[in-house]
Structures are given as structure tokens and as C-alpha cells.
Amino acid sequence: MAAVGSGGSNAAAGPGAVSAGSLEPGTASAAHRRLKYISLAVLVVQNASLILSIRYARTLPGDRFFATTAVVMAEVLKGLTCLLLLFAQKRGNVKHLALFLHEAVLVQYVDTLKLAVPSLIYTLQNNLQYVAISNMPAATFQVTYQLKILTTALFSVLMLNRSLSRLQWASLLLLFTGVAIVQAQQAGGGGPRPLDQNPGAGLAAVVASCLSSGFAGVYFEKILKGSSGSVWLRNLQLGLFGTALGLVGLWWAEGTAVARRGFFFGYTPAVWGVVLNQAFGGLLVAVVVKYADNILKGFATSLSIVLSTVASIRLFGFHVDPLFALGAGLVIGAVYLYSLPRGTAKAIASTSASASASTSGPCTHQQPPGQPPPPKLSSHRADLSTEPFLPKSVLVK
């Protein structure tokens, strides 16, 4: 079953509908390019806005909301949204929806239970992000959180036997160096620091969040290889587990305080903005990510770091010194280099070899006249088929 916004047949389209295959090449190319730009904007805004909104909501004067309740509310809203989308896919037929959910969730309970582990980790990760962002500037968190690329790569090598290119290993080393510089600047930076913030706790939380993100993402990919479930079904199943596990975490960590002050204690429009961003932002990204290749996603991450830094200067009085600029620059460069597909590196190497050969003698591999140029290398990797299943709203991609 095709997910809404995730492709599918055009057979149900009206007589005036135009299929992608009937478009002129130039029109189709322009439409695809426009979709890529829209995807880039969505990825950048979602990446930066969630972190900035959490930081803003957690540093406002007055009563502070319970982060565990925000995590639960985001899971509830995400699950309800996916349920409505599945209802729309069944053309509003309640009976068909009930039969479908009974088959997909209860009858195939083994597949459903497989999602309990990543859902538990994602729920823990969401709570850790609140702890981290509450104890370090948004820009510092955005840079440090890119360690999830390192942890994901390491878990991919260990759990999926995936190999990395030399360029990717070099970019991971560059990434770690950049994060270390930023954290050194954070630890030794001058200036007043709010008394209720603990940079050490923030760093521990973000490192734990990156470890959980890397493991959960790779584990999720491993168990869903060959799965036929749609984006919305998988996110609904994750939402069910996430809500239940989030309530357990709420009871364990802040149960007494929530019982005394109320579930929605400290909720303001800013807090609701955070909850809605977590719930709906990732679902939106799950739709547009099919138009974004690795390079575009790496570029979006780099732009979101820049946007978070600029916004932090304006909103929170964040000071950018040369050490932070150096570390952030290394991280941005590392993210971009890591996102380059292997074919690009090989193409660059072959281009360099051809250039050197042309200086020493005639080229023996010239393109014959009248023949079309060779096809361009694809920037998609083979393991991207499971990425739309990832709950982007909670991963701050």
C-alpha cells in the first residue's frame, strides 16, 4: 500500500490529470528541481526551528513545563495524525480501516513488537534532547548533535557490515575534531552563564542522545529491511509504543510533580509550538525526504547550523568567537563531505586522472561524435529506502 505523498499509482487521477511520464523533459526537470528546493527549505526550517523553539520554551521566565509531558503529547498527536491519514487512504471507511489495523497491528504482532525497541530508544532520546538543550546554547547543541553521524556510521559498520570510504572516515575524524573544539570553547568560554544550566549535564545528554540515535536508526533499518508497511502505519505503531513508554517515563521521573500540578502545567503557546513541531514536522519531512538526496540533506544540515547560530545571536545573545566558528566550520565541512556518494569521489578521481593524462599525451577515451554522453552518477545510496520510515519529528534531522 502506497503512503500518502510517497508515490503510488496515478490510475485514480481524473481525466485531466497529467502523469509524470507525459511531461516534457524540461518541464519534468524544472518540477523536480523545484521539489528539491522545497525539500531543502523544509529540512532546514524543521532542523533549526525545533531546536530553537525548545531552547526558547525552556528558557522563558515563569513556570517551566514538564518535558516528559511534551514528549507524550507529541507522540499522541503524531499517532492521531497517522491514523487520520490511514483513514483517508481507506476512503473514510471505518470498517476497512479497522480490519486493516487488526491485520497489520494485531495479527502481524511480531512485526509490531519489533518496533518496541526503537520506540523505547526514540522516547529516551526525546527526553535527553530536552535535557541537553536546556543546559547548552541552541547553536552549540546543533553542532554537537552532529555526532549522531559518527555513531550511526559506527553502528552501521558493526551491525550491518557496511563499509565506509576513506573520504567518509576522514570526514568523521573531521567531525569529531570540530565538535571537540566547540565543546572546548563551551567549557572554557567566558561570560556569564545562567545558574540553572549545567554544561556538563548538557554534554552528557547530547552524547547519550547521539548514541541512542545511531543505534536506533541502524536497528530500525535492519528490522524493516523488506517490510511492506507504509510510512503512516510504521509511524502509527511507533506512536502507540512511544505514548505508552512516554507515560511510563513520565510516571517514573516526574509522576509526583505532574499529579500535584497537572499534566499541562507551564504550557504556553511557545510550548504548544514545540509539541506541534515535534509531532508534525517530522511527518512532513518523511514526505519530502524522497526528493532529497544525500548531498541535499547534508547541505540542509549545514544550513540549519548556520541558521541556528544566527538566530541564537538574535534571540539569546549568543556570542560567536573564532574558536566556535572554527569548530562549526569543520563540522559543516565534515557533514558535506560525508554526504557525498562514493561515485562522486570516484568520478573526481577519474576526472583528475584524465586531466593528467591529457597533459602527457592524447586522450584515448574520447566520446565518439554523435553519441549521447554517459549517464550521470546517482547521488542516492542503496540504503535510503528505509529512511522515510524514520520518525523525523523526534530525530531533529
From Swiss-Prot:
Keyword Membrane: yes
Biological processes annotated in GO: UDP-galactose transmembrane transport
Keywords: Antiport, Golgi apparatus, Membrane, Sugar transport, Transmembrane, Transmembrane helix, Transport
Ranges of biased composition (kind: Low complexity): 9-21
Catalysed conversion reaction: UMP(out) + UDP-alpha-D-galactose(in) = UMP(in) + UDP-alpha-D-galactose(out); UDP-N-acetyl-alpha-D-galactosamine(in) + UMP(out) = UDP-N-acetyl-alpha-D-galactosamine(out) + UMP(in); UMP(out) + UDP-alpha-D-glucose(in) = UMP(in) + UDP-alpha-D-glucose(out); UMP(out) + UDP-N-acetyl-alpha-D-glucosamine(in) = UMP(in) + UDP-N-acetyl-alpha-D-glucosamine(out)
Topology relative to the membrane: Multi-pass membrane protein
KW Nucleotidyltransferase (keyword) present: no
Region annotated Disordered, chain positions: 1-21, 355-397
A Gene Ontology term for the protein's cellular component: Golgi membrane
A Pfam family assignment: Nuc_sug_transp
InterPro entries membership: Nuc_sug_transpt
One Gene Ontology MF term: antiporter activity
Family according to the record: Belongs to the nucleotide-sugar transporter family. SLC35A subfamily.
Subunit structure: Interacts with SLC35A3; the interaction is reduced in the presence of SLC35A4. Found in a complex with SLC35A3 and SLC35A4.
Protein's job: Transports uridine diphosphate galactose (UDP-galactose) from the cytosol into the Golgi apparatus, functioning as an antiporter that exchanges UDP-galactose for UMP. It is also able to exchange UDP-galactose for AMP and CMP, and to transport UDP-N-acetylgalactosamine (UDP-GalNAc) and other nucleotide sugars. As a provider of UDP-galactose to galactosyltransferases present in the Golgi apparatus, it is necessary for globotriaosylceramide/globoside (Gb3Cer) synthesis from lactosylceramide.
Protein name: UDP-galactose translocator
Organism (species): Canis lupus familiaris
